A protein has these predicted regions:
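Post-signal-peptide N-terminal segment of Sec-exported extracytoplasmic proteins
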Residues: 46-87
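Surface-exposed or secretory-pathway low-complexity segments enriched in glycine-proline
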Residues: 73-110
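Bacterial N-terminal signal peptides that target proteins for export
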Residues: 2-14
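C-terminal edge beta-strand
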Residues: 32-55, 68-69, 137-151
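C-terminal motif of bacterial Sec signal peptides marking the signal peptidase cleavage site
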Residues: 22-25
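A short beta-strand micro-motif common to beta-rich folds, especially ectodomain repeats
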Residues: 124-136
Length: 151
């Protein structure tokens, strides 16, 4: 019984040491450059459309930012990443104009806010919607061009 407890205790210490080493590996290196900053998990990319083309978007408070996305309708979503200046995610997003042929989900993924559009089943064509981002007065007008699934 004593030998078993000793083995479990050593395993626990080994796990703590390895966790610390892993966290240190993700930090700054000896040249001062930062390690990986944005964490994206498998759940963040699962279910995405096979074809999804999105532009780089940096919304400002002055006027609505235009974003055109192109995707196939294979049952998946197409995600448009947006962030405030200094790579800071927005706190929230409000759907001010709804899409006519799909759904929108606004959520945070790593250091960005992501606007996910999923077209209705069988839809092919053009759809659009507007998202207001908080804090501030930034908004994004998204035009989605959806093609049928690739065979």
């Amino acid at each position: 019984m004593t030998e078993h407890r000793l083995a479990v205790r050593h395993f626990a210490w080994l796990a703590i040491i390895l966790t610390g080493a892993l966290l240190q590996a993700c930090g700054p290196n000896d040249k001062g450059a930062a390690g990986p900053k944005q964490r994206v998990f498998a759940a963040d990319v699962a279910g995405g459309a096979k074809v999804c083309e999105v532009p780089k978007v940096s919304p400002t408070n002055d006027q609505p930012t235009e974003a055109a996305i192109r995707m196939t309708n294979d049952g998946g979503w197409c995600g448009l990443p947006v962030h405030q200046s200094e790579s800071k995610p927005f706190s929230a997003g409000l759907l001010s104009t709804r899409p006519s042929h799909g759904t929108v989900v606004i959520h945070q993924v790593g250091d960005e806010t992501r606007i996910d559009y999923t077209p209705d089943r069988g839809f092919a064509g053009t759809d659009s919607f507007v998202v207001k981002l908080l804090p501030g007065n930034a908004s994004v007008r998204v035009t989605a061009t959806v093609s049928g699934p690739v065979a």
